[in-house]
Swiss-Prot record:
Belongs to the HAK/KUP transporter (TC 2.A.72) family. Keywords: Cell inner membrane, Cell membrane, Ion transport, Membrane, Potassium, Potassium transport, Symport, Transmembrane, Transmembrane helix, Transport. It is a multi-pass membrane protein. The lineage of its organism: Bacteria, Pseudomonadati, Pseudomonadota, Betaproteobacteria, Burkholderiales. It comes from Cupriavidus pinatubonensis (strain JMP 134 / LMG 1197) (Cupriavidus necator (strain JMP 134)). Signal peptide: none annotated. This is Probable potassium transport system protein Kup. It is found in: Cell inner membrane.
Length: 636
């Protein structure tokens, strides 16, 4: 097939396939919101007076050249061509990538621990992104009012806060209704970006010289240290690139690639080159290149459209924070939290009240503290560059250990991408004192909390195993001399089907009865995002009406007792009458001690997190009137 015929076939597929078109438009509305709103502040920050770069046509050409080649190398080549191939059963993102590479490492090895900690730290840095993106995006959009009417400058922060508070308040109701508008609105946004850029570009076509990397390299050589500092601002055009990989599970790789190459990238390039062209004809426009390239009669409509686009970009990272936390809960790094489903049709649309309110408080605090988008720009890059470096490293491990690529090729690609990522990372490190400390502090705090929970759970399991009684011999002895049997079914939720659940021991001790049918139900999280219903359940009959029922779940799924029992009835013929079934749960009270483990204060922190996590009955969606909670104390 020739190149022309291949292109024609691809275009024909896109035009004739309505489902692909819908996915592409959906991806444009969700995946590209962050990177699509970068033109609001990226070039403005590159020409910040603090960088000390003398304004000149060569500086404009050099910076625009760096913007173009950064976008081409990092987004188009690294993410779209290579990283998006590293999917975990169709899912992307640093946690999915971590789960994928951990399959190739020996369990409990030092290498596995390094890979796990890298993945978790990369995920934690996303929380910094989830705080800064809404703040800088909405703030930079509303700042357009200052250009339209300088007298409105004192209202910028109040308007920004009203928009952001409203955005977080509507999360509890879900966004399925307004979410249908996200795609069309963002299509209008990108087309507008492209047209604005084209309008300015034709007035100074010499900006097209910036396609030549010579100008970018010359700029770096001529300005050395100042140019290196500017790289931290150039990186702002790449914020949101990770979303192409993270949201791959929602839309698929093909629609995201279509959206990027057909609409998003061309429009972004046109806009950045248009801003550069405007600066060649109007050097004073460096104050706010985006809004000063807009014809004056269109300024207010542009502020409105930009605000809509930034709200959509903010929604994407908020939803991403909910999804990331849900995955971390299933992987055992975060305490159970109450999860609400906001759409009956879309399983991915969830709402976590605790995360929502934490984000709201932090976002409001950031807007009030930093006041201007240019102040936030210094804080923005460090969170994203950290995640990018980790993603590149883990992707290289996948290339070598999973795909079995030639070591020389992996080294060449891995080092090339890492060199670019580390250059941006180092440039952003120079801004730690100016605001970069904030996402680092936020990400490090989240990492510390997640690792404390993970380590505490390991200690708790170890103590339970030390004191545990082997289940099958115990049941055999119990059935040989059975206590009084009562009608109904008892379901004992347990994390370890090898040992007798503490809840069963307490029930026998205090009630001295055994139900006519006993089921030990265990939920097991696997290293894949979803588990097919055909492979979800396994059952072992211990005789005497006693069963071990294991239910496998992916790390993007939330266990649901109702669905498991329905599935057991359909697939295994195990009939459950909910009102005749009692669910026994052990409620552990963690007691910090001087036993080997964590430091006392970390054990106390873990005990507090354990106490304040969602009740198992709430998390597993069990009717409250069918639950029997039996308390037990465990020293760690």
């Amino acid at each position: 097939m020739t190149t022309q015929s291949a292109t024609t076939a691809t275009s024909h597929y896109f035009v004739e396939n309505p489902s692909t078109r819908a996915l592409v438009i959906g991806a444009i509305g969700v995946v590209f919101g962050d990177i699509g709103t970068s033109p609001l502040y990226s070039l403005k920050e590159c020409f910040s007076k603090e960088h000390g770069i003398p304004f000149s046509p060569d500086a404009v050409l050099g910076i625009i050249s760096l913007l173009f080649w950064a976008m081409t190398i990092v987004v188009s080549i690294k993410y779209v061509v290579f990283v998006m191939r590293a999917d975990n059963n169709g899912e992307g993102g640093v946690l999915a990538l971590m789960a994928l590479v951990l399959r190739t490492a020996a369990p409990r090895s030092r290498w596995a621990k390094v890979l796990m900690m890298l993945g978790i730290f990369g995920a934690c840095m996303f929380y910094g992104d989830a705080v800064i993106t809404p703040a800088i995006s909405v703030l930079s959009a509303v700042e357009g009012l200052e250009i339209a009417t300088p007298q409105l400058s004192r209202f910028v922060i109040p308007i920004t806060l009203v928009i952001l508070v409203a955005l977080f308040l509507i999360q509890r109701n879900g966004t399925s209704v307004v979410g249908k508008l996200f795609g069309p609105v963002m299509v209008v946004w990108f087309v507008t970006l492209g047209l604005l850029g084209l309008y300015n570009l034709v007035q100074a076509p010499e900006i097209l010289k910036a396609f030549n990397p010579y100008y970018g390299i010359s700029f770096l050589i001529a300005h050395s240290l100042q140019a290196f500092i500017v790289l931290g601002s150039v990186f702002l055009v790449l914020t949101g690139a990770e979303a192409l990989y993270v949201d791959m599970g929602h839309f698929g790789a093909r629609p995201i690639r279509y959206g990027w190459f057909v609409l998003v990238m061309p429009c972004l390039i046109l806009n950045y080159f248009g801003q550069g062209a405007m600066l060649l004809t109007n050097p004073a426009g460096a104050e706010n290149p985006f809004y000063l390239m807009v014809p004056e009669p269109l300024l207010i409509p542009m502020v409105v459209l930009a605000t809509c686009a930034t709200v959509i970009a903010s929604q994407a990272v908020i939803s991403g924070a909910f999804s990331l936390t849900s995955q971390a809960i299933q992987l055992g790094f975060v305490p159970r939290m109450r999860v609400r489903y906001t759409s009956a049709a879309e399983i991915g649309q969830i709402y976590l009240p605790v995360i929502n309110w934490i984000l709201l408080v932090l976002v409001v605090a950031v807007v009030i503290s930093f006041k201007k988008s240019e102040n936030l720009a210094a804080a923005y890059g460090i969170a994203v560059t950290t995640t990018m470096v980790i993603t590149t490293f883990l992707a290289a491990v996948v290339m070598r250990n999973v795909w079995k690529w030639n070591p020389a090729l992996v080294t060449l690609l891995g080092l090339s991408f890492l060199l670019v990522d580390l250059a941006f990372f180092a440039a952003n490190l120079l801004k730690v004192a100016e605001g970069g400390w904030f996402p680092l502090l936020l990400g490090s705090t989240a990492f510390f909390l997640l690792m404390t929970w993970y380590s505490g759970r390991k200690l708790l399991r170890a103590r339970s195993l030390e004191d545990g009684i082997p289940l099958e011999p115990f049941i055999a002895g119990l059935l040989a001399h059975p206590p009084h049997r009562v009608e109904g079914t008892a379901v004992f939720l347990t994390g370890n089907t090898e040992s007798v659940p503490v809840s069963l021991l307490h029930n026998l001790k205090h009630n001295r009865v055994l139900h006519e049918r006993v089921v030990f139900l265990s939920f097991v999280t696997r290293d894949i995002p979803y588990v097919d219903d055909e492979q979800r359940l396994s059952c072992k009959d211990l005789g005497g009406g006693v069963f071990i029922l294991k239910s496998d779940y992916g790390f993007k799924e939330t266990p649901d007792v109702h669905k498991v029992l329905d599935l057991a009835q359909r697939k295994l013929g195990m009939h459950f009458e909910l009102m005749e079934t009692s669910f026994f749960i052990a409620r552990e009270s963690v007691i910090p001690s001087k036993l080997p483990g964590m430091s006392m204060w970390r054990e106390s922190l873990f005990a507090w997190m354990h106490q304040n996590g969602a009740k198992p009955s709430d998390f597993f969606q069990i009717p409250a009137n069918r639950v029997v909670e039996l308390g037990t104390k465990v020293e760690i």
